[in-house]
């Protein structure tokens, strides 16, 4: 009973969304790496806890897992904001 109601509702909803593409991916990757470079040097205690096994620890200041997760989270926020802004400006 419930599945037939859901199928009926799905058939009436128009598909207005665009398909996903790779245009903003390099911007998000670059923003994450930039924030990781900055965060390893600006966080008060970047080495407290388990170390993140990164390929070039000296470049990234050998951050802990918590520093890495915080940097990636903030990098994604900055990157998505940049992609949305550039998309609204028509650059991407």
From Swiss-Prot:
Cited InterPro entries: PSI_centre_PsaK_sf (IPR035982), PSI_PsaG/PsaK (IPR000549), PSI_PsaK (IPR017492), PSI_PsaK_bact (IPR037101)
GO cellular component: photosystem I; plasma membrane-derived thylakoid membrane
One Pfam family hit: PSI_PSAK
Topology in the lipid bilayer: Multi-pass membrane protein
Entry's Gene Ontology BP terms: photosynthesis
Transmembrane segments: 21-43, 65-87
Keywords: Membrane, Photosynthesis, Photosystem I, Thylakoid, Transmembrane, Transmembrane helix
Subcellular location: Cellular thylakoid membrane
NCBIfam families attached to this UniProt entry: PRK13216.1, PS_I_psaK
Family designation: Belongs to the PsaG/PsaK family.
Record's protein name: Photosystem I reaction center subunit PsaK 2
């Amino acid at each position: 009973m419930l599945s037939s109601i859901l199928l009926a509702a799905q058939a009436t909803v128009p598909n207005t969304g665009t398909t996903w593409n790779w245009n903003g991916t390099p911007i998000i990757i670059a923003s994450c790496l930039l924030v990781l470079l900055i965060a390893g040097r600006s966080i008060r205690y970047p080495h407290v806890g388990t170390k993140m096994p990164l390929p070039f620890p000296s470049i990234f200041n050998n951050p802990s897992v918590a520093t890495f997760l915080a940097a990636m989270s903030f990098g994604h926020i900055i990157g998505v904001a940049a992609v949305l802004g550039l998309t609204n400006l028509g650059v991407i």
